[in-house]
Design a protein with these regions (language model features):
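Short, well-ordered alpha-helix to beta-strand connector turns
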Residues: 18, 40, 74, 101, ...
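Glycine-rich, highly charged phosphate/nucleotide-binding loops
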Residues: 59-69, 132
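Rossmann-fold NAD(P) dinucleotide-binding segment
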Residues: 68-118
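Active-site-proximal catalytic alpha-helix in oxidoreductases
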Residues: 159-163, 167-173, 178-217, 222-240
């Protein structure tokens, strides 16, 4: 069994006198910085000067400064920037101001694991990765609970890296829900696999194929949209709350028998073999090398062509009209 921690097993004392420099103020940076501040830690925010994030962080009551200055002042440098800009900002602003005994902290380990950032040996390398979006991290904290996190130490120069890691996790509220020990390698490879094979890539492809199958079978696109896409959330919510068998116990007998006997026809051994191919391409660096090459040569255009194709698909056109009906006041 994996090592776990709960809130009452952890103290903030080891980091209460340290300065936490949050680098970046996007969805995770905003949530984690505010949670740590509300937990009584000394938080500063490092940002590019003059941007919207700077003004927002100041409005939220934070002491805001350049990334370079935040690195100088911080004891724990908590990097919450988008993956693809971490390497350059580290090289230009963080590395020149990083001194012995500080900690580089992350919520995703890709930059260290794939060596986009090559950290020195005289700092701690730690990770606190909430298993949910920043909005949920903040929302659950304010509800006096939290979003669970997986935590890891890659390099313990000071001998206090775990105290720092667990302190950050407690301060953002994650320890209230529970912490699970992992490793940088495991976090990166499983996170990317989840995104590609089921959570984003696999789920989107499955839904699209189901929609196309119904429409090609002569059914109305609007009905196909409900069956293939809209109702998925109801099932996922049950699986998340009660487990897979808990979901089966809460659907109709017809759905239970049909799903149990036909699901393996849809997701068969060939599907699992393809998942293994995806995992292998992550493990051996194929995906990382492809993604870096594509991003460096094309930037966001690396995925724009795929997004454009999706925008032109019937499921998107029908979906926009269906969502207007169900959420008339919302904008997309």
């Amino acid at each position: 069994m994996a090592k776990t921690w709960k809130d009452n097993e952890i103290s903030l004392d080891p980091i209460k006198d340290q300065t936490i420099a949050v680098i970046g103020y996007g969805i995770q940076g905003d949530a984690q910085a505010n949670n740590m501040k509300d937990s009584g830690l000394n938080v500063i925010v490092g940002l590019k000067e003059g941007g919207k994030s700077w003004k927002k962080a100041e409005a939220d009551g934070h002491k805001v400064m350049s990334v370079a200055e935040a690195t100088k002042q911080g004891d724990i440098i908590h990097i919450l920037l988008p993956d693809m800009i971490q390497g350059q900002i580290y090289k230009d602003e963080i590395a020149p101001n990083l001194s012995e005994g500080k900690a580089l902290s992350f919520s995703h380990a890709a930059a260290i694991y794939w060596k986009w950032i090559e950290a020195p040996s005289n700092v701690d390398l730690i990770m606190v990765a909430p298993k949910g979006p920043g909005s949920k991290v903040r929302e659950t904290y304010l509800d006096n609970f939290g979003t669970p996190s997986i935590v890891a130490v890659e390099q313990d120069f000071t001998g206090k890296a775990w105290d720092r890691t667990l302190g950050i996790a407690k301060a953002i509220g994650s320890a209230r829900a529970g912490l699970i020990k992992t490793a940088f390698k495991e976090e990166v490879e499983t996170d990317w696999f989840g995104e590609q094979a089921d959570l984003c890539g696999g789920a989107a492809s499955m839904v699209t194929n189901a929609f196309e199958t119904l429409v090609e079978g002569g059914y109305q696109p609007e009905i196909a949209y409900f069956e293939a896409l809209h109702e998925l959330k109801l099932i996922v919510d049950m699986i998340q709350r009660y487990g897979i068998n808990g979901m089966w116990r809460r659907v109709s007998e017809t759905a239970r028998y049909g799903g149990l006997t036909r699901g393996p026809i849809v997701m068969d051994a060939a599907s699992k073999a393809n998942m293994k191919k995806v995992l292998t391409m992550i493990q051996d660096g194929t995906f990382n090398n492809e993604w870096i090459s594509e991003y460096q040569s094309k930037g966001s255009e690396a995925f724009d062509q795929y997004m454009k194709q999706n925008d032109e698909h019937q499921i998107e056109k029908v979906g926009k009209e269906m969502r207007k009906m169900m959420w008339p006041d919302s904008t997309e």
